Amino acid sequence: MTKEVIVESFELDHTIVKAPYVRLISEEFGPKGDRITNFDVRLVQPNQNSIETAGLHTIEHLLAKLIRQRIDGMIDCSPFGCRTGFHLIMWGKHSSTDIAKVIKSSLEEIATGITWEDVPGTTIESCGNYKDHSLFAAKEWAQLIIDQGISDDPFSRHVI
C-alpha cells in the first residue's frame, strides 16, 4: 500500500501570493518534543520572475552566514527549484514577522555592505559548483527585493 503524501508547497495557490514575503509553512514536533518551523521565504513573484542561478547561489551562501549572525536556531536555508526564494528551516518557534526582519536585514547587507571576500564557500574545496556565483546579481536582486518591501503576509502586503 502506498502512503498518501501531501506536499504543502504544491497545495499553495502560487497565483494569489504577493512576493516578496515570508510565510510560515509548518511547525512540526520531533519524538522528543523538539519544534521545527519551516518558512517560505519568497523573494520574487512566482511564474513572473526568477533569480538566475549564479545570483541565487551567491544569495544562498550569504544567507547561510548572515541569518545565523542575526538569529539562533537556523537549520538550513535552501533555494526553491523554481528559483523564486528559499525554504528556511529553524529550531523552535519563530514568527513570520521576526523572520522577515532577519531576511530584510540580511538583504540590506548584501545590497550595500558585502564584498566578494565576504562571500563564504566560493572555492573548489568548499562548494560543489564554485564557478557559478555572481555577487553583482546577488546585490542587484537584494536591492530590488528591498525596494519592494518584504511582507510578513503572503496574501496581502504587510511590509515590515
Swiss-Prot record:
EC class of the enzyme, as a word: lyase
The record describes its quaternary structure and partners as: Homodimer.
Matching entries from HAMAP family are given as: LuxS
Q: Which UniProt keywords apply?
A: Autoinducer synthesis, Iron, Lyase, Metal-binding, Quorum sensing
Recorded catalytic activity of this chain's protein: S-(5-deoxy-D-ribos-5-yl)-L-homocysteine = (S)-4,5-dihydroxypentane-2,3-dione + L-homocysteine
Q: How is the cofactor bound?
A: Binds 1 Fe cation per subunit.
Q: Does the keyword Nucleotide-binding apply?
A: no
Q: What is this protein called?
A: S-ribosylhomocysteine lyase
Family, according to the entry, reads as follows: Belongs to the LuxS family.
Asked if Electron transport is a keyword of the record, the answer is: no
| Gene3D superfamilies registered for this protein in UniProt | S-ribosylhomocysteinase (LuxS) (3.30.1360.80)
Listed GO biological process terms: quorum sensing
Q: GO molecular function terms here?
A: iron ion binding; S-ribosylhomocysteine lyase activity
Binding positions for Fe cation?
57, 61, 127
State the EC number(s).
4.4.1.21
* Disulfide-linked positions: none
Name the InterPro entries on file: LuxS_sf (IPR037005), Metalloenz_LuxS/M16 (IPR011249), S-ribosylhomocysteinase (IPR003815)
